[in-house]
Amino acid sequence: MPSRAYHEGLWQAVPAGLAPSDLDLRRRFLLAHVDPGMRVLDVGCGEGAFAAALARAGAQVVGIDAAEEPLRRARARHPELDLRLVDGEGEWSLPDAGFDAVWAGEVIEHVADTAAWLSEVRRVLRSGGALLLSTPAVGRLTLLRMALSRRAFEVRFDPRGEHLRHYAPGTLRGLLEDFGFHGVQVRSAGGVPGERHVLLARAVRSRF
């Protein structure tokens, strides 16, 4: 199980957060699926950029993160937001079925116990609510480089790296379906054809 030091270390490694173009790509995807008045949980809210965008769009937002450093930055920039520190791998102190949507931007690849994490997402989502997430993609050109170069493979899948897991569209879709989500949509975005760098997914929580 990753320690709090692991999560804090991620934010020391990326002090500036996402690049503006990457931020905009994910923000447009997120806001396309959220309506005013919806109750939205931002999991791994980081510096609060997405939570702030959701609030401006009229959503009722709660942001949670497993690291104190990004929350400190977020509270300084967005004091109006409801932002909370949680155990990254344990149960969140949030009500059952309390949200219409859960957003997790660049989070699932850092989760050691994916089964427990998805079970917690299901618990806090209402029946019929949507999970929206983004995660880095492994493009075809990257796969080709890894097939041709042992060094490229080792760098990408170094267990000491910041990503604990890597997902392809099919594996992400299958994982979400296995955990009781339906209508799963996964698409590659960003970058160039053959080397898309992000997966964007939407999945609906089943009633059972």
Segments predicted by a language model, with ranges:
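Short glycine-centered segments of the SAM/dcSAM-binding site in methyltransferase folds
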Residues: 39, 128-130
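Conserved class I S-adenosyl-L-methionine
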Residues: 132-154
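A short glycine-rich, Lys/Arg-flanked "PGG" loop and its adjoining helix->strand segment in the class I
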Residues: 116-127
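A short His-aromatic
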Residues: 106-110
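Conserved N-terminal segment of class I S-adenosyl-L-methionine
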Residues: 1-95, 101-105, 118, 157, ...
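Short N-terminal helix/helix-N-cap motif within the alpha/beta-hydrolase-1
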Residues: 69, 112-116, 143
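A short hydrophobic/small-residue beta-strand
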Residues: 61, 131-132
